Amino acid sequence: MDSLHLHEIVAFIKKNTVMFIAMVAAIVTCFFVPPDSLYLDYFDVKTLTCLFCVLAVVCALKNINFFYMLARKIVQVFRNIRMAVLALVYITFIGSMLIANDMALLTFLPLGLFVLTSTGKGKYMAFTFIMQNIAANLGGMLTPFGNPQNLYLYTKFQIPNLEFMQIMAPPFVVAVVLITLCCIIFVKPEPLEMKDEPMTVPTGRTVLYLLLFALAIAIVFRGIPYWIGLIVIPAVLIFADRKALKMVDYPLLLTFVFFFVFSGNMARIDGVRRLFSFLLEKSTLLFSVISCQVISNVPSAILLSQFTENYRELLLGVNIGGVGTLIASLASLITFREYTKHNTGKTGSYILLFSAFNFAFMLILAAFVMLF
């Protein structure tokens, strides 16, 4: 029994590695900055509430196959693998703008797996997953709720909606062009056949969940006080779909909590404050991109925001920096986990291909933003 529990604990830690790294980092910094009343100022309750509300409603929509059916219908319009891959990538791209990058991947990676395996096109799986991953990370850059770091910076600096999109539009357009070119160049227009399996969604619950989704988005855009969503959305889902509340990615929320503690403490260590302030003064954009490659984009956004008011370059840096290493984005770990789960023994080749495409995208986008 003990060994069984130990196995379950190890499996849980492996599944939530980033959360445990964040927890350890937070605990270590507590030795340098002992807990006090200032800790309460570390936590951005509104950001955590927005994340929870969006994740909960997305889980409810996922449970009625809303995204799956929507995506599958779009894919079935196309008759060759190149167009199908483009459709999968664009669905993930658009989905990340609406439901955040990690949830877009959790929703549409299984669809990509289904399309490729059911049509005998498994050879394109690594490429498709990598493009979906890049699309999720870069597609989410355009909107405040497209990824967690955007939501955090948007809330912290109170960035106006129009200004936010003006900052992110140029690299967003370049990303669209690059992703499209890659899919055209690396995927042949081979014929594609897929069985049409009818699927329906309950109309009443669909309307209800879409209304809740609209409420969640209104909270993100500051149209409604966050506490209203924190009361209404869980209350409705308790009766409509209790399972959705259990499915919420709570480790992601805890990761944020731990990184709030970590970044808050780091900001109070004099040596760290002086070093980061110096580096960010030299180039906020470049340092934030590099930081993402080491500690991921979400913690980079949380940590570096303590040392600079240059939210424009920080916003660009933590979005562009989301592509690069496997740990540059929490979403990339989702893709890696999903791919290796179905392709054991191909980890090395996947990491090589992943690194080649991601670093190419990062360098091109960083150069574009710095030059133009």
What are these regions (language model features)?
Residues R72, I185-L210, R242-K246:
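Flexible interhelical linker loops that connect adjacent transmembrane helices
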Residues E8-K15, S37-T47, I159-P171, P198-G204, ...:
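Interfacial loop-to-helix junctions that mark the boundaries of transmembrane helices
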Residues D44-T47, Q76-V89, S118-T128, T203-L208, ...:
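Membrane-interfacial loop-to-helix junctions in multi-pass transporters
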Residues Y42, I64, Y68-A71, L212-E309:
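Transmembrane helical segments that form the transport core of multi-pass membrane transport proteins
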Residues D2-S3, H7-L38, C50-N65, I184-P189, ...:
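Structural signal for alpha-helical transmembrane segments and their membrane-water exit/capping regions
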Residues Y90-L138, Y152, I302-L315, T344-K346, ...:
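Hydrophobic transmembrane alpha-helices that form the pore/transport pathway of multi-pass ion
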Residues M165-V176, L286-F372:
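C-terminal transmembrane helix pair
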Residues G120-K188, E193-P198, R337-L365:
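Membrane-core helix-loop-helix motifs of multi-pass transport proteins
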